[in-house]
């Protein structure tokens, strides 16, 4: 495949051709298509698919009320990152990552957390036992465990939860038309019996563990592909077995296991179920939307309008295929309209870093509320409007004799104040053109082998733009490297690393120690420290000589291959409250990471 630069060197007639396998639509227009619409039919096999109403007979809800409702309070949230999210990862979470994710969810305020499928894997079983026996679960948090309806799996599930204070046992079976026909090859009565037999087994097992407060959740899996009348029959039959009460309700979870229709169709089905389920006052109606059609957030919000009480999802929308509904987006959508989500998103970057670390998946730059670029305007007119909005906020605050943080947020193009989620205005009101940043990042990677993190790209591109505007003309790759070297690699004051000796832990979870020789303001001194790796040990050592350093972000990569390969490390650090990026380059990734810390310290400290 030709590179971008190679494509530009092709014959001018071919340089801008793309996607030669795509055939321009040349078919007839649709019946009744207006003359002002020039689009034509494609050659794609549309005939292989059919409208949703022909696949699952819809319920006609002519007196629907959900469109007129207004959300004024948060639903009960259930975070399923540790199970439904974890099962979709290329590399499932390690036990350490699971503990970090669980701790994050607890600190954010989630009171119901799905922690695993203990009958499906020994890893999940061990994790559930660990957090119970270690006393990790706070008194106000209920763990949720998933199981199929098979008796031996239910027994194993209850065994995993022994001695827990409060547990939701979530049992499920698929009820859809397609799965009944293709997977189970069973009729409605047989599939319903699977659910009721599972419910009876859950009740039976609960009696064996009287020290735990048990609650039950049932999901007619593939609910969106199930006839509504039949879904109601199955749920009602399960309810008759469980015998819930208003004080100890059952959770009926209605998942869009595969998103099959527009969000309004899902909302209609939720309102119909909410109206028609037996013993509704003893039911918590729960939603679990997936994002196959890209409308999981809308489906969840409209389903909540339609009568649901609870929503299951994952932080930043992790999950099978296109993911579960994003709890960050749902929560901050409420926040942006003045409704407390009852979840703390006040440091969105810390949340994102933990999620990226645990999931080993990057959060997209454009992901609502959490992406690197979501509070950034590249358009000049947008920047102008934002600047004027921020200025007007100050004027309004002064007129009200109030602090700007205490008045109504009203700034064009920014649905919330970035500072309310731990961001700053710097990237909002001081940005370069997108091509400027893109060009800097491209040259640094293509010519110098450096894959700068996004926020470092933004910072460094400002330095390049300042020089370009001051001197005029083009900044060559060599000139760009000189600027980078001078800014990030050259400074040796006040801190200079001379050498170090690292004693790595021999076992997982052990401590690493470091002894290093450094110069501080020109004076050579010996320092030592201990941590869970060389970087943490070095930072600990710096703390002993009065340098308080906290790593906010870290990344590394090999710059080339072969025996003479170099490694690059990037550290965003807080040094005595001042944040700065540092860069280190060395044959060893350990040395590169230590150099990056030194670089960050020197850039953060007065020179």
Swiss-Prot record:
Region of interest called Disordered, as start-end residue ranges on this chain: 1-40
Gene Ontology cellular-component annotations: cytoplasm
Pathway(s) of this molecule: Amino-acid biosynthesis; L-leucine biosynthesis; L-leucine from 3-methyl-2-oxobutanoate: step 1/4
BP GO terms, sorted: L-leucine biosynthetic process
Region called Regulatory domain, residue ranges: 491-607
Keywords assigned: Amino-acid biosynthesis, Branched-chain amino acid biosynthesis, Cytoplasm, Leucine biosynthesis, Magnesium, Metal-binding, Transferase
Comp. bias intervals (Polar residues): 1-10
EC number: 2.3.3.13
Cellular localisation: Cytoplasm
Domain of life: Bacteria
GO molecular function, one term: 2-isopropylmalate synthase activity
UniProt: Mg(2+) binding residues: 84, 288, 290, 324
SUPFAM superfamilies: 2-isopropylmalate synthase LeuA, allosteric (dimerisation) domain (SSF110921), Aldolase (SSF51569), post-HMGL domain-like (SSF89000)
The reaction(s) this protein catalyses: 3-methyl-2-oxobutanoate + acetyl-CoA + H2O = (2S)-2-isopropylmalate + CoA + H(+)
Role noted for this protein: Catalyzes the condensation of the acetyl group of acetyl-CoA with 3-methyl-2-oxobutanoate (2-ketoisovalerate) to form 3-carboxy-3-hydroxy-4-methylpentanoate (2-isopropylmalate).
Complexes and interactors: Homodimer.
Sequence similarity: Belongs to the alpha-IPM synthase/homocitrate synthase family. LeuA type 2 subfamily.
Protein's UniProt name: 2-isopropylmalate synthase
Primary gene name: leuA
């Amino acid at each position: 495949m030709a590179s971008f630069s190679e494509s530009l060197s092709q014959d001018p007639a071919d340089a801008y051709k793309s996607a030669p396998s795509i055939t321009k639509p040349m078919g007839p227009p649709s019946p009744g298509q207006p003359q002002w619409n020039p689009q034509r039919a494609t050659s794609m096999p549309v005939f292989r698919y059919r409208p949703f109403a022909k696949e699952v007979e819809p319920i006609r809800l002519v007196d629907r009320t959900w469109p007129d409702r207004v959300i004024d309070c948060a639903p009960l949230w259930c975070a399923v990152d540790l199970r439904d999210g974890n099962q979709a990862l290329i590399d499932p979470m390690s036990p350490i990552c699971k503990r970090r994710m669980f701790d994050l969810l607890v600190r954010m305020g989630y009171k119901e957390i799905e922690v695993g499928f203990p009958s499906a894997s020994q890893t999940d079983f061990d994790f559930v036992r660990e957090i119970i026996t270690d006393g990790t679960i706070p008194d106000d948090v209920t763990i949720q465990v998933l199981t199929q309806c098979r008796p031996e799996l239910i027994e194993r599930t209850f065994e995993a939860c022994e001695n827990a204070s409060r547990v939701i046992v979530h049992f499920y079976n698929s009820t859809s038309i397609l799965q009944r026909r293709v997977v189970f090859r069973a009729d409605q009565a047989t599939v319903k019996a699977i659910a009721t037999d599972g419910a009876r087994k859950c009740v039976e097992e609960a009696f064996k563990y009287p020290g735990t407060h048990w609650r039950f959740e049932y999901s007619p899996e593939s609910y969106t592909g199930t006839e509504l009348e039949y879904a109601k029959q199955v749920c009602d039959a399960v309810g008759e077995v469980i015998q819930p009460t208003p004080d100890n309700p059952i959770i009926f979870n209605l998942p869009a296991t595969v998103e099959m229709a527009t969000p309004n169709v899902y909302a209609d089905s939720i309102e119909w179920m909410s109206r028609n389920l037996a013993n509704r006052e003893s039911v918590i109606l729960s939603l679990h939307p997936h994002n196959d059609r890209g409308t999981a957030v809308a489906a969840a919000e409209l389903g909540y309008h339609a009568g649901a009480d609870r929503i299951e999802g994952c932080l930043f929308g992790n999950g099978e295929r296109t993911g579960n509904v994003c709890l960050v987006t749902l929560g901050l959508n409420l926040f942006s309209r003045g409704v407390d989500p009852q979840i703390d998103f006040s440091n969105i970057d810390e949340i994102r870093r933990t999620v990226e670390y645990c999931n080993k998946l990057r959060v997209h730059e454009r992901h609502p509320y959490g992406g690197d670029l979501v509070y950034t305007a590249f358009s000049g007119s947008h920047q102008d409007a934002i600047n004027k909005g921020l200025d007007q906020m100050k004027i309004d605050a002064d007129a009200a004799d109030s602090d700007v943080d205490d008045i109504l947020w009203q700034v064009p193009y920014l649905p919330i104040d970035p500072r309310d989620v731990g961001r700053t205005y710097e990237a909002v009101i001081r940005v370069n053109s997108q091509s400027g940043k893109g060009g800097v990042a491209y040259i640094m990677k293509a010519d110098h082998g450096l894959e700068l993190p996004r926020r470092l790209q933004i910072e460094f591109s400002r330095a390049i733009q300042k020089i370009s505007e001051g001197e005029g003309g083009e900044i060559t790759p060599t000139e760009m490297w000189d600027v980078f070297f001078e800014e990030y690699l050259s400074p040796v004051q006040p801190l200079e690393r001379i050498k170090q000796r690292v004693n790595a832990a021999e076992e997982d979870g052990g401590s690493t120690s470091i002894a290093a020789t450094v110069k501080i303001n020109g004076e050579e001194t010996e320092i030592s420290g201990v941590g869970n790796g060389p970087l943490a040990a070095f930072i600990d050592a710096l703390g002993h000589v009065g340098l308080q350093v906290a790593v906010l972000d870290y990344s590394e990569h090999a710059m080339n291959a072969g025996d003479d390969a170099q490694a690059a490390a990037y550290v965003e650090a807080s040094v005595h409250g001042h944040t700065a990026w540092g860069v280190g380059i060395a044959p060893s990734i350990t040395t590169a990471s230590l150099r990056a810390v030194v670089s960050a310290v020197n850039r953060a400290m007065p020179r």
